[in-house]
Structures are given as C-alpha cells and as structure tokens.
A protein has these predicted regions:
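Conserved N-lobe beta3->alphaC-helix segment of eukaryotic protein kinase catalytic domains
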Residues: 17, 22-47
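Conserved N-lobe ATP-binding subsite of Hanks-type protein kinase domains
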Residues: 4
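Conserved catalytic-loop aspartate of Hanks-type protein kinases
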Residues: 175
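A conserved loop-to-beta-strand element in the N-lobe of protein kinase catalytic cores
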Residues: 61-71, 79-80
C-alpha cells in the first residue's frame, strides 16, 4: 500500500481532528499517481453530508509525498462494524441498517448527479462519523463519466456487478449493485456472494 492515514489536529483548531492521508508517490507508476490526483479532484468538487469532506492537499518531502487533509470519521468503517457484530454473533438493528443504507444511497446519488462512478463501493470504503452517519470515501479509482460507458475492470470482487465481472461496458448501475451487496452484508454479516 502506498498510503497511511493519520489523525491530526491543526494548532489553530484546538479539539478539531482531521484525517490526513500520506501517499508515497515516489514509488508510484503514472496510473497510480493519476488515481491519487483524481481523488483530490473529485473530493474537492463535492460537498455532501454523506461523502467524506475534503479540506486541503499538498506535497512534502521534496515532492515525494502527497498529503490529503479530509474530514475525520473516527469510528472506523462498515467493514470493522460488520466484523464486530459477527464476532458477537449479533445482528444489527434494522433501523440502523436502513439508516446506513439510505445515507449511502444519498451520497451515491450526489456522486451520480455529478456524473461520477465510484467503482469501489465496499464496506471498507464507507466510513463511520462520530454522529453515527456513514460517509462514502476512498474515491481514488472513481471516474467522471464523459458520455461513453466505462470499460476498466476495477473494484473489489465481492461487490462487483455482473457487467464488470464479464468485462462489459458499465456505468452508474455498477455502484448501485455494490450498495445492494452492502445492504445484504449489513443484514447477513457476510457478503452475498462467497
């Protein structure tokens, strides 16, 4: 992995924490660097309560590191939450599942209205805020649609739509499929297709 995320506090903002993602760009290929820049471009263009907020980005260490300052979602992600419930052998309350599902759909709707396909919706990319809300994050492989359908086979196998698996052209429906897989996972505490 090229990146690590740190919890940081700016001196002028006592008590306010941010997530600071450090990306070692010195060892990246061109395509991987393009993904990192893409995440900044997309995050900086969107402001939505269910998408991780963007604050700043800068280069450091003689331009070998890219740092992205984002909203802190200090309660982990849906993958860790599902795992905690699975270990307890206890299911999530239906109201919590519905709340998370609706918030994911609203965040996804915002992306899609901006013609952005996330392409890697999965439990580990849905973050939990202190207020209990969920936020879509990790937009590095997201793609802004420019008319033609997408063709690159990308994402996480458990959440890939049939058209992505079959290497066929796809669009926003691939994200909708992935959110459906997540809804199933929140209810059953396991991905639908294993």
């Amino acid at each position: 992995a090229f990146s690590q995320v740190y919890k940081v506090e700016r001196r002028g903002d006592r008590g306010v924490h941010y997530a600071c993602k450090r990306i070692d760009i010195s060892k990246m290929q061109k395509a991987e660097l393009a993904d990192a820049v893409n995440e900044i471009r997309i995050l900086s263009s969107i402001k939505h309560p269910y998408i991780v907020g963007f604050y700043d980005a800068f280069l450091a260490r003689r331009d070998r590191e890219l740092w992205i300052v984002m909203e802190m979602c200090g309660c982990g992600d849906l993958a860790s939450k599902v795992e905690r419930y699975r270990k307890k052998r206890k299911y999530m309350d239906e109201r919590v599942v519905w709340s998370h599902f609706i918030q994911m759909c609203e965040g996804l709707q915002c992306l899609h209205e901006q013609k952005i396909v996330h392409r890697d919706i999965k439990a580990a990319n849905i973050f939990l805020a202190a207020d209990g809300s969920v936020k879509i994050g990790d937009l590095n492989v997201s793609k802004r649609m420019k008319g033609a359908l997408l063709r690159t086979q990308i994402g996480t196998p458990y959440y890939m739509s049939p058209e992505v698996w079959l290497n066929k052209p796809y669009s926003f429906g691939a994200d909708v499929w992935a959110v459906g897989c997540l809804a199933y996972e929140l209810c059953a505490l396991r991905p639908p297709f294993v």
